[in-house]
């Protein structure tokens, strides 16, 4: 019996040794592959108005993806911290909540904090500020007009009887509350508005998809008493009706919302409002 066990051990041990060697070799190869530099190029829009004679241009940076987080914002922060401290961009939450880091990445408007880096090392990732906006510096667009338009729709609850304000809750049914889903989640990043050709050419008059979706959000809020007044403010030819349902807005929204549908609903409400007004 002992002889049989000895023979079995002799047969088993060399195989185990060989298997262990193979496993170590595989691990070594994986480690070598992991530590080999993975150099990714980023071409980033640069312009500094404080530099006399400076013109907009693209500047290329190289990042080793082995030493960088997975998101485009990680790469931008690494570039600013370790390579070029003059690179300027907005950022805050890093979780797709605040909308600060909205920019155009590889041809599409999105959030740098939620867009993963394209790991194809043969392709250069191109990063621009949001299109058709005045640029303050580098990747920072001037959102003054965008915020002024948002302010113009009075994006807050309005009551005609304010005698009970602060004294009681304004209740909603479950069904009434569900109407706001897909609207209130907007983070005002302006990705949708700056992807809209109508907003590119009429941004001074056309409110754009982001602002109109928020206008709709308050129009259908059962607690608000100023739906008709809100509609009346949008009757001119530009504020609402420059939307031609191109739907770039819906395609680019980083939160998966549908501004195009909201605008279509406003147009339907506007038709009903005008009929009611004409028959009055």
UniProtKB/Swiss-Prot annotation:
Q: How is its activity regulated?
A: Enol-oxaloacetate inhibits the succinate dehydrogenase activity.
Q: How does it sit in the membrane?
A: Peripheral membrane protein
Q: Which GO terms describe its cellular component?
A: mitochondrial inner membrane; mitochondrial membrane; respiratory chain complex II (succinate dehydrogenase)
> Domain 4Fe-4S ferredoxin-type: where?
176-206
N6-acetyllysine: residues carrying this PTM: 51, 55
* EC number annotated for this UniProt entry: 1.3.5.1, 1.1.5.-
- Where is this protein found? Mitochondrion inner membrane
User: Where does the record place the 2Fe-2S ferredoxin-type domain?
Assistant: 40-131
Name the top EC class: oxidoreductase
The prosthetic group or cofactor this protein requires is: [2Fe-2S] cluster; [3Fe-4S] cluster; [4Fe-4S] cluster
Annotated region described as Interaction with SDHAF1, given as residue ranges? 146-218
Binding annotation for [2Fe-2S] cluster: 93, 98, 101, 113
Organelle targeting sequence: 1-28
Catalytic reaction equation(s) = a quinone + succinate = fumarate + a quinol; (R)-malate + a quinone = enol-oxaloacetate + a quinol; (S)-malate + a quinone = enol-oxaloacetate + a quinol
Concerning PROSITE patterns, the annotation shows:
2FE2S_FER_1, 2FE2S_FER_2, 4FE4S_FER_1, 4FE4S_FER_2
* Keyword RNA-binding applies: no
Provide the cofactor note recorded for this chain's UniProt entry.
Answer: Binds 1 [2Fe-2S] cluster.
Q: In which pathway does it act?
A: Carbohydrate metabolism; tricarboxylic acid cycle; fumarate from succinate (eukaryal route): step 1/1
Binding partners and assembly: Component of complex II composed of four subunits: the flavoprotein (FP) SDHA, iron-sulfur protein (IP) SDHB, and a cytochrome b560 composed of SDHC and SDHD. Interacts with SDHAF1; the interaction is required for iron-sulfur cluster incorporation into SDHB.
Question: Function, please?
Answer: Iron-sulfur protein (IP) subunit of the succinate dehydrogenase complex (mitochondrial respiratory chain complex II), responsible for transferring electrons from succinate to ubiquinone (coenzyme Q). SDH also oxidizes malate to the non-canonical enol form of oxaloacetate, enol-oxaloacetate. Enol-oxaloacetate, which is a potent inhibitor of the succinate dehydrogenase activity, is further isomerized into keto-oxaloacetate.
NCBIfam families associated with the record: dhsB, PRK05950.1
Q: What is this protein called?
A: Succinate dehydrogenase [ubiquinone] iron-sulfur subunit, mitochondrial
Organism, by scientific name, is Sus scrofa
Lineage here is: Eukaryota, Metazoa, Chordata, Craniata, Vertebrata
